[in-house]
A protein has these predicted regions:
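Short, threonine-centered small-residue motifs that mark membrane-proximal processing/anchoring sites
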Residues: 2-9, 13-23, 193-230
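Helix-boundary and membrane-interface capping/anchor signal
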Residues: 22-209
Length: 231
């Protein structure tokens, strides 16, 4: 019985992991004005391995991005953004130079103000993919430059507008990333290098308190598996 119970719990856990494998944020044009969602990022840098650049996790390199929907007008969706460089020891210096994401609906253009006041699109170093839209403090497109939001800087706030190719009732954004510049750790084995985030994770305090119907269905199915195993 214990083996069957363990298998049931493992199946439920596996289903939950698969459901949350990709971080996607969604806003409704009518119901979600004023809604804030926040993602957190880790970090990685390009280590040289056998004469190849390999994306390698770097402990302590981290940041967050919060987006608040403020207005929808035709094809234009406007958000307030807040970027925080939360890097900790052993990282002693880093700057967030770019943030960006992909969209399910095609984006035809974008604009922004504040520190991250330049928009673009294109390849993201170390990720092996291109971003539909990105906003940068310096540099070109989604690569970024040498300036940005440093560890001791105040949270960077501004506004950005996404122009979709067609009017849409739902904004669905995914594949979030940030670029880091001037990354240095305590012993300087990593000194003044650029980096990119790995996985983006939806922060718990932005999750609705009531589970969505799909989540309820998964929970009920899981409880049924466990109950059956116990019998």
């Amino acid at each position: 019985m214990l083996f069957r119970l363990s298998m049931a719990v493992a199946l439920l856990a596996g289903a939950a992991t698969s459901a949350n494998a990709v971080t996607t944020l969604m806003w409704s044009s009518t119901a979600d004005v004023g809604k804030t969602q926040t993602v957190s990022f880790d970090g990685q840098y390009g280590a040289s391995v056998n004469k190849k650049t390999v994306a390698t996790p770097l402990a302590g390199l981290s940041s967050t991005l919060a987006l608040t929907l403020t207005k929808v007008s035709g094809k234009d969706w406007t958000f307030d953004y807040a970027v925080d460089n939360t890097s900790l020891a052993p990282v002693v210096a880093s700057k967030v130079s770019v943030f960006g994401f992909d969209s399910r609906g095609k984006i035809s253009g974008g604009s922004s103000n504040g520190v991250f006041g330049k928009s673009g699109s294109g390849p993201v170093p170390l990720l092996g993919s291109s971003a539909d839209i990105c906003f940068r403090a310096s540099g070109s497109d989604c690569t970024g430059g040498n300036s940005g939001l440093a560890i001791d800087d105040a949270v960077s706030k501004g506004s950005l507008t996404l122009r979709f190719e067609k009017a849409t009732p739902l904004a669905e954004l995914s594949s979030f990333f940030v670029r880091y510049a001037a990354v240095t750790n305590a012993d300087k084995s990593i000194n003044n290098v650029n980096g990119t985030s790995g996985d983006a994770v939806l922060m718990a305090d932005t999750v609705d308190s009531v589970p969505e119907p799909a989540s309820w269905a998964m929970m009920i199915t899981g409880f049924g598996l466990i109950g059956g195993a116990m019998r």
